[in-house]
From Swiss-Prot:
Residues 1-39 form a transit peptide. It is an enzyme of class 1 (oxidoreductase). GO terms for molecular function: cholesterol monooxygenase (side-chain-cleaving) activity; heme binding; iron ion binding. This is Cholesterol side-chain cleavage enzyme, mitochondrial. The lineage of its organism: Eukaryota, Metazoa, Chordata, Craniata, Vertebrata. One of its GO terms (biological process) is cortisol metabolic process. Residues 27-47 are annotated as: Disordered. GO terms for cellular component: mitochondrial inner membrane.
Length: 520
């Protein structure tokens, strides 16, 4: 993370030109007022070849990128390039060429050209594994009509408001159990508080949550003895993400040819993910077939099977993708949120006050409480602004379009640099400050096409509503029970492991409210 308290320009790479120049805003470009149309111009567009670029030799570019150890700092690489080239640039790394944009108005214009079947960039090692080993695919990889067919079904069972209501009684007890786990740790340490890095606990919390929503059953990941098979799944997801980065810029054909250790580890991780997900799905599938009545919501798997709108193979593929996507992503966002709260105690107290007021007004009804915590929900947006799960959002426009006065041909990969956007003072005042209130202002132009942590539109993250609910419930219970502090004051930097992760352990202090939570 960029150093809080330092001027923004001084926190960036020293070799970069100053961020702010006289009479200019943002990374080397005039700030376009919201509504003026950053992507639309009456001028004759300039050709694609004139878009600023480090050069057209992708392999030389990749060599220099690797020399600078760019793979794990690609989010800073984007910032440096926007400083150097302005609000739009193109870059070819290996065989992959992309156009990068940063201005929210340009983003809004881009999405108008995504078509009926929006396409994102497929992560090469993931796609290579599925193709080489003939694994079934869900909405993560499907295209066109096949994608839309599955997505419409999942929207009903996973994204719709009525479906989300069913998830509350499944997710709320998991958050309560996490609080109990921390209280148990406090008692074990015997110092009246718990100090530690809870990353692994958050992984288990996230897996317990997503499996409960999928299958309507608990796995016991927060108990004293953790199921070793479930832990293998969590470890495999972690390894799958971490082994992806070294393989991103290499032709997939080389993976099988050279059989490097990284590729072998990547394959082994995916094998474990598929094997465990298949096992869980089959166990709960057989269990559900034997039941005719359910006291509680039986989970997404049951409803997908009951609807008969998907083939069983497609159900399994989508369940596998949601399980794999629901561990590191949610847990990492929660870790960053706790980190930011611990560094901004005044914000933490504001959030706690809101939660306690909501508890009192809702008379303990958690469903009503969820409608009364706008600042808490804004704090999740703010965490994703500072620490987005993905550093870019990608689209292949369906037809030619003009961005920043340049003609972009149809099917060109255009990447929205959401990490860089979130750190640009042209788009966010005081961008290094953790300030959830920025999302609650009445001026909608200030947040127009800036909240992109879960993607956008019909191709946004299919697990978005689950993740938002899961994180909100978790934070409600943490704020009611603990004051969260940093063990040591200092910045934690980020590294790119396909998702943004801390470069070192984050040690937090959890101080319980021994007499119950403070009064609102």
């Amino acid at each position: 993370m960029l150093a809080r308290g330092l001027p923004f320009r001084s926190a960036l790479v020293k070799a970069c030109p100053p961020l702010l120049n006289t009479g200019r805003e943002g990374w080397g470009h005039h700030r376009v007022g919201t509504g003026e149309g950053a992507g639309i111009s009456t001028r004759t567009p300039r050709p694609y070849s004139e878009i600023p670029s480090p050069g057209d030799n992708g392999w030389i570019n990749l060599y220099h990128f690797w020399r600078k150890k760019g793979s794990q700092r690609i989010h800073f690489h984007h910032i440096e390039n926007f400083q150097k080239y302005g609000p739009i640039y193109r870059e070819k790394l290996g065989n992959l060429e992309s156009v990068y944009i940063i201005h929210p108005e340009g983003v809004a214009h881009l999405f108008k050209f995504e078509g009926s079947y929006p396409q994102r960039y497929d992560i090469p090692p993931w796609l290579a594994y599925h193709r080489y080993y003939q694994k079934p695919i869900g909405v993560l990889f499907k295209k066109s009509g096949a994608w839309k067919k599955d997505r419409v079904v999942l929207n009903t069972e996973v994204m719709a408001p009525e479906a989300i209501k069913n998830f509350i009684p499944l997710l709320n007890p998991v958050s309560q159990d996490f609080v109990s786990l921390l209280h148990k740790r406090i008692k074990q340490q015997g110092s009246g508080k718990f100090v530690g890095d809870i990353k692994e606990d958050l992984f288990r919390f996230a897996f317990e949550s997503i499996t409960n929503v999928m299958f309507g059953e608990r796995l016991g990941m927060l108990e004293d003895t953790v199921d070793t098979e479930a832990q293998k799944f969590i470890d495999a997801v972690y390894k799958m993400f971490h082994t992806s980065v070294p393989l991103l810029n290499l032709p997939p054909e080389l993976y099988r040819l050279f059989r490097t250790k990284t590729w072998r580890d990547h394959v082994a991780a995916w094998d474990t993910i598929f094997n465990k997900a298949e096992k869980y799905t089959e166990i709960f599938y057989q269990d559900l077939r034997q039941k005719t009545e359910f006291r509680n919501y039986p989970g997404i798997l049951y409803h997908l099977l009951k609807s008969e709108k998907m083939l069983l193979e497609d159900v399994k593929a989508n369940i596998t993708e949601m399980l794999a996507g629901g561990v590191d992503t949610t847990s990492m966002t929660l870790q960053w949120h706790l980190y930011e709260m611990a560094r901004s105690l005044n914000v933490q107290e504001m959030l706690r006050k809101e939660v306690l007021n909501a508890r009192r007004q809702a008379e303990g009804d958690i469903s009503k409480m969820l409608q009364m915590v706008p600042l808490l929900k804004a704090s999740i947006k703010e965490t994703l602004r500072l620490h987005p799960i993905s550093v870019t959002l990608q689209r292949y426009p369906e037809s030619d379009l003009v961005l920043q006065d340049y003609l972009i041909p149809a099917k060109t990969l255009v990447q929205v640099a959401i990490y860089a956007m979130g750190r640009d003072p042209a788009f966010f005042s005081n961008p290094d400050k953790f300030d959830p209130t920025r999302w609650l202002g009445k001026d909608k132009d200030l947040i127009h096409f800036r909240n992109l942590g879960f993607g956008w539109g019909v191709r946004q993250c299919v697990g978005r509503r689950i993740a938002e609910l899961e994180m909100t419930l978790f934070l409600i219970h943490i704020l009611e029970n603990f004051r969260v502090e940093m063990q040591q004051i200092g910045d934690v930097n980020t590294i790119f492991n396909l998702i943004l992760t801390p470069d070192k352990p984050i040690f937090l202090v959890f101080r319980p409210f021994n007499q119950g939570p403070p009064q609102a």
